[in-house]
Structures are given as C-alpha cells and as structure tokens.
C-alpha cells in the first residue's frame, strides 16, 4: 500500500487531494476552487513579508508602504498582494456563480462553510484596505465603520469600541492590522473544513445527477487541469502586476490620509461595489445597512428557496434566463456603486437593488414551481 495511504499525517491529505472521487464530466469551471487556494496561499506569503516592513502608526503607515519600493523585490510583494486581492474576489465570484448555476448550494454544509469563508474574506479585505492609510483608506474606514451606529441603542458605543476612541485613529489602525494578520489563518482553517465537507458530500456534477456517475480520482485527471488553470492565471496576473499595477487602485489612496480634507467621491474597492450600491439605494440609514448585510446573508438561505425538482439550471430554461439576468444585474450594481450619487444613477441603483432581492426571494421559488408544473405535468398524469 502506498505511504500516502498508510501514514496518519498523509492519509487525510490523500483523501482530500489525491484519491478524492470526482465526477468524470466536470469542466474548467471547477478550477476556481484550486485557484482560490492559490490566491489564499499567495496572499498569506506576500502579506507576511509585507508586514515585516509595515509600521502600524498613523504618522508612519503611509511612508512605510511606500518604503517597500526600496526593499529588494518589494514592489513585487506589494503589487502581487494588492492585485492578488482582486484576483481572489474575481475567482470567488466565479466560484459562487458556478454553484448557483449548477446547484452546488444544495450540498448544505459545504455551501454554508463557503459563505462563512466569503464573509470573512470580505472582512479581511476591508481591514487590509485601511492599512495603507491613504485618503480613501481613512475615509472608507470612517464611513464603513460608522454604519455600525445604525444599531439601535448601542450603535454609538459599538463604533467607539471599534475605533478605540472618538474617531478613526492610531488605535483603529493597530487593531485593524492585528486582525488583518490573523484572519487569513482562520480562513485557511475554514478552507480545510470546507474540503472535509466536500469529501463527505462529494463534488457536484454539471448535470446535477444525485446518483453517482462514473467517478475518477482527483489526481492526475484534475490536478493536470488545475495546473493548467494556475499557470494561465499567474500569467494574466503577472501582466497586470508588471505592466499596469495600479489599474484597480484609487488615485485618492496615493495621497496621505488627512482628516480635514474629504475626497470628492468615497467608494470602496470594486469587489465591494455591489453591496455599496445597495447601501446607497435605500434613503434610510438603518434600512440601507440592513439591506447591505442581507444582500450577502441571503446566500445562507438560498437552499431553502430552491423549489425545483432539478438540481441545476442546464435543464431549466426559465431558470437560466433568470440567472443570466441576475449576472447582468450584479454587473450593473457594481457599475452604479462606482458612480456619484445623482440622477439618473440614484433611480437606476434603486431598481437594480430591488431586482437583486426580487431574484432571490420571489423569482427563484416561483420559477421552480412553474418549471415543475411544465416539465413534470405529463409525468404526474402518467402516475395517475
């Protein structure tokens, strides 16, 4: 028997990454899981080296980030970390989108742990965005943390507790740096839990069949596909890092934080813009905060909203049309979140935010029932 199966340390790894039974018909859309593992490893490694040259003090934080250019290959560490975060979220959205399309959310434990990973990743990215201590970092931290004041009765106290004072200051920066360093390791633990549940539940099949199709071992059939995806992704990331490293950066963040000067337009990174657009679309502060958090937490309840007898969308024509309309709606939300708050963008933002919740709460269960009646009506007659 091979050592990888006998050794108590290697045996769990073998079950998760080598001899894992996998459907024989999965496509390259299943590569995003391995790409996310690559992104997490890259962020942890580059982040550890960057932290060696970072100073979590309001007078030195901005300069210490710029000082990375004087370190050997410091610019590579900095730009791979910054653009790696965007790649992380891009792969994350594709990974979630694939699960929504092929019914991966019906594997409850795997899906729920995945959503927890998504939430913690968003928190980690927000904390990291504050650390350069540029104008957008400072004012983004001020605006986003101030949303906690919408909590009835204790909101103001919670905000001051998060700040460590009466405004965003050195205490805020220090605790944000500590948490930003800690969270990726918690993410790594959750990823292992995610893989364990995946090993128990099994990988989803593109056809959505509950009965096992012809399974093959993960290695070497899918590790080869994963390596191909990893090489292509690293090539594309390298093109961005070497040729246009500041493509996704905000110009305001190249100015040191100044509490006396407010940027013309405060906005988060692109991967938060869909939630930011939903926040802005509600005139009431409390309603906006609740809607923003619900836009993410609603994914927890998505399996409960599934009413179709079919697992995925390949055999559900109406469900497919609704899904692609949701993708367009998501892109519109991201676009609206990057624009100034004025007409006609306000009304457009409210309409696309309304459709976002309409898709999850009404369209998904309604189309499930309609398709059940259309697709299985003849079968019901035969049973009678």
UniProtKB/Swiss-Prot annotation:
Its cofactor is heme b. Heme b b566 binds at residues 95, 194. Heme b b562 binds at residues 81, 180. GO terms for biological process: mitochondrial electron transport, ubiquinol to cytochrome c. The chain crosses the membrane at residues 32-52, 75-96, 111-131, 176-196, 224-244, 286-306, 318-338, 345-366. A ubiquinone binds at residue 199. CDD domains: cytochrome_b_C (cd00290), Cytochrome_b_N (cd00284). It is found in: Mitochondrion inner membrane. GO terms for cellular component: mitochondrial inner membrane; respiratory chain complex III. Belongs to the cytochrome b family. This is Cytochrome b.
């Amino acid at each position: 028997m091979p050592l990888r199966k006998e050794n108590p340390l290697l045996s769990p790894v073998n079950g998760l990454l080598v001899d894992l039974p996998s459907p024989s018909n999965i496509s390259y859309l299943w590569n995003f899981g391995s790409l996310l593992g690559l992104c997490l490893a890259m962020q942890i490694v580059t982040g550890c080296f960057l932290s060696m040259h970072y100073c979590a003090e309001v007078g030195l934080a901005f300069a210490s980030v710029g000082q990375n250019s004087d370190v050997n290959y410091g610019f590579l560490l900095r730009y791979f970390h910054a653009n790696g975060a965007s790649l992380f979220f891009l792969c994350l959205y594709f990974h979630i989108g694939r699960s929504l399309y092929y019914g991966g959310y019906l594997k409850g434990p795997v899906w729920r742990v995945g959503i927890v990973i998504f939430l913690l990743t968003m928190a980690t990215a927000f904390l990291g965005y504050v650390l350069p201590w540029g104008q957008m970092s400072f004012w983004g931290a001020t605006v986003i943390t101030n949303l906690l004041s919408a909590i009835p009765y204790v909101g103001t106290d919670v905000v001051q507790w998060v700040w460590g004072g009466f405004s965003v200051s050195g205490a805020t920066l220090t605790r944000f740096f500590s948490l930003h360093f800690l969270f990726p390791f918690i993410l790594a633990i959750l990823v292992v839990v995610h893989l364990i549940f995946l090993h128990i539940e099994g990988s989803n099949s593109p056809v959505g069949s509950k009965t096992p199709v012809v399974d093959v071992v993960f290695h070497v059939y899918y590790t080869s596909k994963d390596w191909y995806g990893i090489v292509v992704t690293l090539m594309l990331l390298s093109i961005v890092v070497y040729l246009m490293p500041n493509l996704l950066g905000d110009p305001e963040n190249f100015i040191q934080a100044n509490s006396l000067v407010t940027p013309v337009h405060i906005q988060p990174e692109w991967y938060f813009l869909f939630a930011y657009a939903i926040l802005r679309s509600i005139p009431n502060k409390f309603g906006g905060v609740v809607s923003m958090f619900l836009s993410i937490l609603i994914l927890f309840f998505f399996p409960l909203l599934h009413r179709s007898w079919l697992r995925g969308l390949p055999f559900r024509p109406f469900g497919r049309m609704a899904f692609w309309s949701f993708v367009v709606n998501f892109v519109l939300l991201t676009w609206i979140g990057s624009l100034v708050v004025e007409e006609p963008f306000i009304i457009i933002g409210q309409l696309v935010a309304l459709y976002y919740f309409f898709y999850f709460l009404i369209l998904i269960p309604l189309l499930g029932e309609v398709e059940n009646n259309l697709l299985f009506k003849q079968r019901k007659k035969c049973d009678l």
